[in-house]
Design a protein with these regions (language model features):
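Bacterial Sec-dependent N-terminal signal peptides
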Residues: 1-16, 182, 186-189
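Short glycine/proline- and aromatic-enriched beta-strand/turn motifs that initiate or cap beta-hairpins
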Residues: 8-60
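Transmembrane beta-barrel strands of outer-membrane/channel proteins
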Residues: 15-23, 58-64, 78, 94-102, ...
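Sequence/structural signature of outer-membrane beta-barrel proteins
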Residues: 22-28, 47, 51, 62-69, ...
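Solvent-exposed loop/turn segments connecting transmembrane beta-strands
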Residues: 28-39, 52-53, 63-73, 88, ...
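Outer-membrane beta-barrel transmembrane domain signature
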Residues: 81-189
């Protein structure tokens, strides 16, 4: 109900969809990593302050990644961001965020029980997911809510990862995405 009221007030919902490569790495030490561990993310954005050459916004997102030798994860979270835009369509953006991550192993795990090893059921692990993102993009038209292609470098952590051993596991995601308005946009009218 509240989501529909907010969408109606904006006359079209600003959305982003991205695919990305996920990696366990120290932030800002790598840009492109191999092998590829695929993921995707969908977000709804809500402007807080929209000016001709910049905007402050919040975003609610959900996503998934698959890291074949480690885990697969489902997450939901939010971001606070600021984007600046040039007259010819180039944009730069920074975001800080926090979310909840639920991971599940991708390989069988075993425990020693009653003198033998038995497969352990995976109920998943919940973790806090703080993040910092830098983004550049290009808007195809000068309209405030025109379609945009973007590249985002996101560093994030899993906390607690392995208490008593590795408290925080750092990750990076390299996103390629599109930002667009879903529904009729009459905000310029």
């Amino acid at each position: 109900f509240l989501f529909s009221l907010h969408c109606g007030a904006q006359k079209g919902q600003l959305m982003s969809v991205s695919v990305y490569n996920q990696s366990t790495a120290i932030p800002f030490t790598r840009f492109v990593t191999t092998p590829v561990h695929p993921g995707f993310q969908v977000a709804a954005e809500f402007d807080l302050n929209d000016r001709p050459h910049g905007r402050a916004f919040t975003a609610a997102h959900l996503g998934y990644f698959y890291h074949g030798h480690l885990a697969q994860g489902f997450y939901v979270g939010g971001d606070l961001g600021y984007e600046t835009r040039t007259r010819f369509g180039l944009s730069f953006c920074g975001m800080i965020g926090v979310g909840y991550l639920r991971t599940y192993v991708t390989q069988p795990e075993y425990i020693f029980q009653n003198g033998s090893y038995v497969r352990r059921p995976d109920k998943g692990n919940g973790r806090l997911m703080p993040s910092l993102s830098l983004e550049t993009g290009y808007y195809f038209k000068p309209a405030r809510r025109s379609t945009q292609l973007f590249v985002r470098y996101q560093s994030w952590g899993e906390y607690p990862y392995s208490p008593g051993f590795i408290e925080l596991m750092s990750h990076i995601n390299l996103h390629l995405g599109v930002r667009f308005t879903l529904g009729k946009d009459t905000s310029a009218e």
